[in-house]
């Protein structure tokens, strides 16, 4: 089982950069959303723990599914049928894996 996150120590290095605390504090609105949403992080350490867990899941999906599908997706490519785009079969598999993991919409606001 490949994991593009845990297998790449450079990613972890960047996430522990001293500026990350300031970035996370800004992104998380100084952790005020924790008062409204029980799943919002309460502090920097909690946020980093959440990021780490999500990235482990994403890294596993990328290592086990997305990466191995890449060459086939490039070879097959998308097509247009009756004015509608049809994804390569590997793209559908990738999207379904991300959906099943609950990762679709991760960048949307909590409310």
Regions found by a protein language model. Give the residues of each.
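Extended, charge-enriched "interface" segments that sit outside catalytic cores
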Residues: 1-81, 85
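Internal helix-loop-helix
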Residues: 59-60, 90-111
């Amino acid at each position: 089982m490949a994991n593009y996150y845990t297998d790449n120590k450079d990613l972890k290095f960047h996430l522990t950069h001293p500026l990350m605390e300031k970035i996370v504090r800004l992104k998380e609105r100084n952790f005020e959303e924790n008062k409204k949403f029980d799943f919002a992080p309460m502090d920097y350490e909690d946020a980093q723990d959440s990021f780490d867990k999500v990235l482990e899941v994403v890294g596993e999906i990328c290592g086990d599914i997305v990466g191995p599908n890449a060459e086939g997706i490039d070879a097959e490519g998308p097509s247009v049928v009756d004015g509608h785009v049809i994804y390569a079969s590997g793209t559908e598999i990738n999207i379904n894996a991300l959906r099943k993991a609950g990762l679709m919409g991760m960048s949307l606001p909590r409310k």
